[in-house]
């Protein structure tokens, strides 16, 4: 089914609701280009749904410009900007028309996929011959500071609530269905000046077959960031598919956290066992899809998990529950915050075991179960294991208790010889302690080449000693008596 936002997007500035000053500024700007006068690029800044992109496309249509657009769904790194935008900024289109370049949501440029994108945009803007319109929700991001100096900034405010009902009536007329004026005003008041959101809400109610004021009142308020409590109220109270799925659209919580909130508050709202069982059944199915998302890294399954946990639980009840219900945060978050220190101790112990057993911490947990049994039954063996795994006394107390840990460390202390550390006595005046002469270290056998050198030196010394001896003790003269 085609989205009505695209189907009924204004084709001309005259069809755009409100923004009269902005429209006139755009007309003056584009006519300067048509007359050959180069102008600075324009940056349209405003909240989502205020009509920034619509204004850019409408002015292009009015003045017969071809549009080249890069939005948040496109890869917008340095190379892409240079190849696509850089080329289009200085040349005509294939049809011979002038080209209007639209860079949507430039404040969303971030991460590795868009690396160098902002710097390349600034480079392109300085040499652009064709008109360029940029849009942003938050123009005062630090990354856009240099960019702001190279553009003409035009602030686009939210659409006035009074300008929304005529647009909704026009769409209802073209789609061929009747709608109560109270429903239109309720949708407009819930939109918070977001025309796109108002059209989406109208389509949700119309396709769901329910155009009652009561259903329109359950639509989420978009005038500010919606809290998780608002989302809980909508999911638990509504029986409308589209309203339930849109309940978490403006909530700044991940699906895992939202799932915990629903799980915690479901028994508070659903008092009939059949409704409660149905709600948890859909919630468990959403958990399966969330697991597949992370396991397979296939984020296309994300929307199924979201639909099951919101619309699934909302439609599980047979009828709405009246009255006020006090919703609260998941108790698991409180427990996790309380046990943060304990969980960190367990991680440290598992890391030590994993290091010694050359396994992961996940497998080390299985090993730890057996170790605890040994710790509680055999202090002697436990002492050796504690020394091997280098566990501290505090860690042992955490795994067992103080008594068991004390017994094990007593065994460890008994195995090691105690070294008495006495304080040195004062020296007596009459007696002095003899200094202890350290023994000469044993010299190992010298290597073969060194042996030859040592032998040669020893022979030379021996020869010199012999000569010296002969000088001191000369030989006596030999006589015939020595032969007899």
Curated annotation (Swiss-Prot):
GO biological process: DNA replication
Keyword Nucleotide-binding (UniProt): yes
This protein's UniProt keywords: ATP-binding, DNA replication, Nucleotide-binding
Lineage: superkingdom: Archaea
InterPro entries, alphabetized: AAA+_ATPase (IPR003593), ATPase_AAA_core (IPR003959), P-loop_NTPase (IPR027417), Rep_factor-C_lsu (IPR023935), RFC_lid (IPR047854)
Zinc-finger found in the keyword field: no
Positions with a binding annotation for ATP: 46-53
UniProt signal peptide: none
Family: Belongs to the activator 1 small subunits family. RfcL subfamily.
Subunit-level organization: Heteromultimer composed of small subunits (RfcS) and large subunits (RfcL).
NCBIfam families recorded: PRK04195.1-5, PRK04195.1-6
Role: Part of the RFC clamp loader complex which loads the PCNA sliding clamp onto DNA.
Listed name of the protein: Replication factor C large subunit
Gene designation: rfcL
